[in-house]
Amino acid sequence: MTTELEIQKAGKETGIQIWRIEDFELVPVPKTNHGKFYTGDSYIILKTTALESGRGFEWNLHYWQGKESSQDERGAVAILAVKMDDHLNGGPVEHREVQGNESAAFKGLFPTITYLIGGVASGFTHVEINEVEDRKVLTRVKGKRPVRATQVPIKWTSLTDSDSYVFDIGKEIYVWSGPKASHFEKNKAIQYADGLKNERQGRAELHHIDSLDDKESRTMLKDFFGEAFPGSIPSGESDTVQQVGTTIKLFRISDDSGTLKITLVSENSPFNQGDLSSGDTFVLANARTNHIFVWKGKDSSRTERASAANPDNSFFNKIEMPLTSKLTVLPEGGETANFKSLFTNWKSSRDQRGLGQVHSINKTAKVAKETFDASVLHSNPKKAAESKMIDDGSGKTQIWRVASLRKEPVPKELYGQFYGGDCYIIMYTPQRGANVLYYWQGNKASINERTALPIQTKNTHETECDGNASQIRVVQGTEPPHMMMLFGGKPLIVHLGDTISPTGKSKAASTRLYQVQSFFAGRCRAVEVPAKSSHLNSNDAFLLITPSGSYIWVGKGAVESEIQGAKDTAGILKISKYEIINENQEPNEFWTALGGQSDYWRDEREEGVPVEPRLFEMSNATGNFIAEEINSNYVQSDLNPDSIMMLDAWNYIYVWIGKEANQEEKMSFKSLVDNYVKTDGSGRSKDIPREVFDQGKEPLSFTGHFLGWDKTLWD
């Protein structure tokens, strides 16, 4: 009866509700104990959020299983989660959480997660923990975001040299950190102990232990452990987190034959949305992130849905995933951005939310001409984050072409023109703030030039910028909005071939075809393509230059800024006369110049799916790429000065180098980022621009991803 009443209360107002499973019933946990979990128990956590429309709610339902919880409790929590999901009409996104391997969404619910020894079977209940008498508790503080405070047995062997500990004896609270513990964990242990002190309203004293064998602490520790300090503390293991694997597979769960079967649909990601059908339940197993998604078709049977929501060992064996994998259950129509990013051109009717933009996978959404007001960037950080802009590009620009082991200045009259067979360094000096170095790699650049490019960029960073510049790697075709703004409103032009003359220009072909696309604030790229009709595209405008005359071809989907961009390109290339023709109204001479009429792309470009930015802390401690994803509600204080952080904004990657990051990480982070992009299963371009900068030199486009950025936070 208690369970039915609690389910009726679930999800009716915004906030977090938590229940512990006691004798197969839901028992609410007081808000003062949210974030504290007994390792012998299982819990349901429901987060309710109001829709932006104001008409209803959306829910994230987590069912958490402690490492020491019984099989009955684990089964009960899954069954009760399904009941709550049914009560909410299948609307929640469900997450199976295993102690120590919780999802980023779960970790984002609590500033600290505390694991308490015992459980309901041992008589432990969630009561106000502010008593100061008869206490003896040893807590290990480990991890980053959030910190995990785990009660451990009161033995000397529970200590390691890489973690921090809190010795709680009621009226006295002691903090000790191993010599290899990070600064971050040391500070968090102090904060955790200070929180215990505050709970006791001044009835406890806080002390710091510098050495386990000094005179002041020797007596206390002997009383606490029941024996003297053994003389040494063992080494601890690193808090290893997410390791990239290799496979991403899609399975179908169906009981159409009368027997529940799991069959492989595809192991070639990104998948097609058409691989899913409403009549069945599907499982997407991502071994690269140890994450399992269960997609519930709206017409799938309850048996199919329940089998995936409460999986047994055979389920994990069948899909070749570890038992500790994160598991997220999604209703049809309630797919998360991370799930949709593993499909090509997912079509959704749901509105976009958050800082993420709608980006296309291997496509580019065009933007009509608009006025860009750089003054709003400082007052509107979100705008800076969305636009990837630091200013309006009106500062000073200097460009060099990289030739083998040297760089050559590009004549100013050729600024904005690049050759696809070359590499370039663009140094931008804004009117305020640090310099920006774009190092641009043409798609046809030689291996020698591609190798020399980062070396010459590093040299430029030291000699021209005094070591004070953001460095942004750009591959042809992925130029970020700010780089597009550096050429006085003119198109960015990319020619075929490479530079072979001292003037910085290569001899042009007699017939040339330039594809013109509009992007941020109406700025255009004009890219030379082979002069064949098969390279036309109905979505764009084209400039065709021939010995007998020139044409601007206007595709049916071209916007005004693209037509103007084609005109501007003609002017830059000294083409004073041209004929403007619309698609399907071409003269014979036009097709003759292109080698005859043939098929070309005529379909409208599709928009991609909304993908919200993701923050990672990077590590190469094991020799493989390892990244810990920070909870989805990340804040500025999640940036760890001891580490290198990566913010994946989908079509742009930021790398933040903390002041205390070690030299090995600084030397290897580029390969770690490359591996991250290479192993991404979304199908997006592997040539995403990457911007690298030091702590304290963050661009507006980065800080705008953090609510209320504080420049003095680390002072």
From Swiss-Prot:
* Annotated residues for binding of Ca(2+) 1: G421, D422, E449, T499
One Pfam family named in its UniProt record: Gelsolin
Positions bound to Ca(2+) 3:
D642, E665
* Tissue-specific expression: Predominantly in the body wall muscle, but expression is not restricted to muscle cells.
What is the recorded function of this protein according to its Swiss-Prot or TrEMBL entry?
Calcium-regulated, actin-modulating protein that binds to the plus (or barbed) ends of actin monomers or filaments, preventing monomer exchange (end-blocking or capping). It can promote the assembly of monomers into filaments (nucleation) as well as sever filaments already formed.
Family from the record = Belongs to the villin/gelsolin family.
Q: What is this protein called?
A: Gelsolin, cytoplasmic
Species annotation: Halocynthia roretzi (Sea squirt)
